[in-house]
Amino acid sequence: MNLKKFSCLEFPDSSNKGDKMKKVKLLFGVHMHQPVDNFGDAVDEAIELCYAPFFATMREYPEFRFAVHSSGWLLNEIKTKHPKVFDDMLYLTKKGAIEWVGAGYYEPILSAINSLDAQAQINKLSRYLEKNLKSSPKGAWLTERVWESSVIRDLRACGLEYVVVDDYHFLSSGFDGGAMDGYYESEAGGEKIALFPISAALRYALPFFGVERSVEAILKCAKDEDSAAIIFDDLEKFGLWPKTHVWVYEKGWLKGFVEAVLANEQIETMHYKEYLETHRSKGLAYLNNTSYFEMGEWSLKSHQGLALEALKERLGDEYFQKDGVALVKGGIWKNFFIKYHESNYIHKRMMHHSKNQVQLKKGALEALYKLQTNDVLWHGVFGGLYLPNLRDNAYRYLLEIESSLAKKKTATSFLDVDMDGYEEFKVLTSELSLLFSSRYGGQLMEFGSLEKLFNWQNTLMRRHEAYHEKILHPKEVAPKIHEEEIESIHSDAALLDPTLKDDLIYDWHPKYSFIDHISTEAFSFEAFKGASYHEVGDFANRPFVFDEQRMAFKREGGVYLDKKYDTFCAKRYSFEAKSFSLALELQSEYAHELHYGVEFNFHFAHPDKVLLNGQKVGDGLSLVGVEELVLEDSYTQKALKISLDKKCMLHAYILNTISQSESGFERTAQQISLLLSLPFASRLELLTQMEVCDV
């Protein structure tokens, strides 16, 4: 992204040193975060490669003032397991080097949770900082810089006086890029807060530019004696991102940068709160509901993202940066709930319990706050929603809440959980949390074990992403860097595995379970895996009506051949503590042979290790004459046993998705997909029992 017209005006070069008479206040801040309960080795790697060497280096320069925000759980993890790193933080805090900045303890998107929870999370982190670091925050880090004016009241209610956003927030709202060298003030309902605009130019420069160019970038922000160069960005850029550890520490970038800043008489490092106390605001600002520009791109559906990219290219960098930035933009962060129904489901399940939290015990309330962690709800250049372990964590917290509410007697309810206008049938036994969709064929959309806190229905749909075009139509992209610099992860220069194309398959319906397919042909393995079978029924992704008296989902649908043949489908469920059964009735006026298939999709932590009737799924398998199948999972020490009253053909494969991450493109095993099929003519009755057993 070309940022020449963003704040600080332009990236400097060695021939443009800035005005030597003007000084600038450097407001330098870093934010560190790991998804709540992330893999231990991932957290340890972040600490070893990034957090530990950063604070160890900064300890040598206590006169360098800077701001730090950390999600609360990560800070406590460091305090508990890496006391030396925490000691460096405490030392720098006592020396007046660090200003601690607040936010939600578990790093929620504040505008995506209610005020009660937002204030509870903000206050929880503030109390932690006061108790353990003797620091009371005055400012807030805005998670993923997702701005809605509704957050002002919550921040002010918690005693916070300022928040950092991107300069893009201002530019997209019509502000001049040359006036981003201080703070503005905004309000909501008369509650006022200060807004500091983070310089995109500095965000893309540090630590990727060499030391000299980095200092020159800061000096470019010097317009008058009150000017501030504002940078607040991911600490992970300083050691954890690809190639940065060697660059920042082994090659000495950080040490050289800090020394160069301290030696430069034109630059004064200052805390945000100090600048707020000693300088006037630049005026009043009302900002769009937005995040950083890239987030707006990512939240669009794939065809819209490609159209936005093409439009930017047609406008050209110069016009876009000068005038187009206020007019051309992507979607809002909450679009991720529209783009990914899997994200929306997690979010709305959380919101349902938040709304009814008066009935939650302390442990369940803490699980609710953990469930509000943002990482799993979106996807961009990082894995996010595509990472199964993040979704597993989210469902663990959700099932902790459900477990606290479960009784010996099975409880049922009918409510629109995901707020899509269609009600879901919710079943809570003493052992299982189950939800069935009326919008999608009476299908199973949650299958959670209250004992293991694991959701076997934590599945993902294969969908087209804008970045898949880089795999389908690769282009040679040369990295545009100077000597003594490194690339950002936003560079398009990435090595592509040519076999990734093989897994670029796209589904036309959500990957739930008990999905009803009808075809004129026997289902082949290749057609099932490739989603290329000839579907002639309208039951796989269409609404059913729920009959509360018979506990059954029904649809008056059709089989579509030379004409529509009226076809009726009824699905009646019954429940026990650890099992449930489905009695299927299918009646069609089409009298000739058709093929019925029932699709299951089950998520496992390690799909490659699961045994299906004693053998691994591997590259896929097919079995004939199946009346019973058992999926043994060593991770949960449970087995899913499916019994049928008729012999079926079985096809099974491990479903992979191709997603983008900070290290390139990744093939991720999401779930095991199964299809049990058999022929029928006019009428079919099929009884299926699902049981959870110990291994």
Where are these regions (language model features)?
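Active-site and substrate-binding clefts of carbohydrate-active enzymes
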Residues: 22-52, 59-61, 180-183, 189-193, ...
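Beta-strand-rich recognition/accessory modules
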Residues: 409, 414-416, 531-570, 574-583, ...
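Acidic-aromatic substrate-binding/catalytic surfaces of carbohydrate-active enzymes
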Residues: 44-48, 116, 120-123, 433-547, ...
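Acidic (Asp/Glu-rich), glycine- and aromatic
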Residues: 441, 446-452, 459-465, 470-474, ...
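A contiguous, surface-exposed recognition patch within enzymatic or periplasmic domains that forms
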Residues: 465, 469-529, 614-685
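Gly/Pro-rich turn-and-neighbor structural signature
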Residues: 116, 131, 135-136, 141-185, ...
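Short, well-structured secondary-structure segments
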Residues: 24-114, 120-121, 138-142, 161-167, ...
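CE4/NodB-like, metal-dependent polysaccharide N-deacetylase domain
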Residues: 117-143, 220-235
